[in-house]
Amino acid sequence: MELPGNIKQAKKAFYGDTALIDGADTTACMQLENMDSMYYGCVALASVQIPDSAKELSNICNGCVNLKEVHIPSAAQKMNSSFFGCTALESITGEIPSSCTDSGNLFSGCKFLSGTLTVSCTSRTTLSSSFSDAATAGTGLTIILRYDAEKSQETANTGFYGGTKSADEILNALKASMEATFSSGSHITITTNADKTEG
């Protein structure tokens, strides 16, 4: 099914469709922003397209146990439980942008996650439960935490870590909060790449 190019929201469009195998064709969707719970519970879903315009992605593929690859859009803002329980998920393309400040349980239970994922961070980024019980099998996942100095300037006075924290302090706090939720069998490595030009 091809979605029209002018569509802006597809919230719960295929919610609970257990027979759906291929997700909708979103090639022409340059304005699609809300995909909240679009494929929630689609247990047979094997492929999905997520355009870079998408912002609202909470629960988009929650429980899609046959999905193996996903793309994270550059405009993402809300990704709470987006791929929760996607037990076959292996590959992630794109990166988690600094605009995303809601990512609780994002990849929880995705035991085969592997490869490298970059997360662009600000003082408002929270990742404490995003990878709980993830990457417990397979070849392992490397997460690169990258400090977004420009975006952090915009949120300096409202950030969860305050406006006086350095890039290293923010990234190290994020790393510690993430590691505290990893299961004992997780094969996840976190590295930080602080931008020393933060000013």
Residue ranges and their predicted role:
Residues 9-15, 34-40, 58-62, 80-84, ...:
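Consensus positions within tandem repeat domains that build extended binding/scaffold surfaces
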